[in-house]
Amino acid sequence: MKIAKIMVLWAALAGSAFAAGLDASDAGDYVLLDKDQRPTHMQQRYYQRGMQWVMDAKQGDSEWTPVCRGTGECRLQTSPAQKVREWKALLPAELQAMPMACIDNKAFAFCRMSKPDNPNMRLYWWFAWRNGQTYALGLNRVQ
């Protein structure tokens, strides 16, 4: 009986690890993909200042420009589970069962999906809102 309880607890803890929020390993440079999954000239850099996520962006070979500094309406925060479920519903059906963690603000969300059997295999998504519509675009990590 004790072993069964330990196994249930272990399974619950292992499952929650896969659904954990973004962490330092998600920091990096990403190129935004278009709707056909081709790289665009838009790049984004996400990193943490202390516990706060911040974001820089650039077009092509231009210099990085600060975009979200962790204050005001651009402050990136851990996304609520209900919002994450809504965004996942926009993705292909075969991806919707994968755990996803996000940070968001008033304009966009940055999200990571991980395979439960291989958490190092990750997919990144950028969700943006415009005129009442949500757009889901892939991100390729470049650094």
Predicted feature locations:
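Extracellular/mature segments of secreted proteins
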Residues: 73-87, 95, 108-113, 117-126
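Sequence contexts marking disulfide-bonded cysteines in secreted/extracellular proteins
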Residues: 30, 67-75, 101-103, 110-112
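Sec/Tat signal peptide C-region and signal peptidase I cleavage site
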Residues: 15-21
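Sec-dependent signal peptide recognition
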Residues: 2-10
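Polar/charged side chains located within well-ordered beta-strands of beta-rich proteins
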Residues: 44, 99-103, 111-112, 124-126, ...
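Edge beta-strand at a domain terminus
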Residues: 70-72, 120-143
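N-terminal glycine/threonine-rich, aromatic-flanked beta-hairpin/loop signature
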Residues: 38-84, 128-132
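Short, solvent-exposed loop/hinge segments that bridge or flank secondary-structure elements
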Residues: 22-59, 94-106
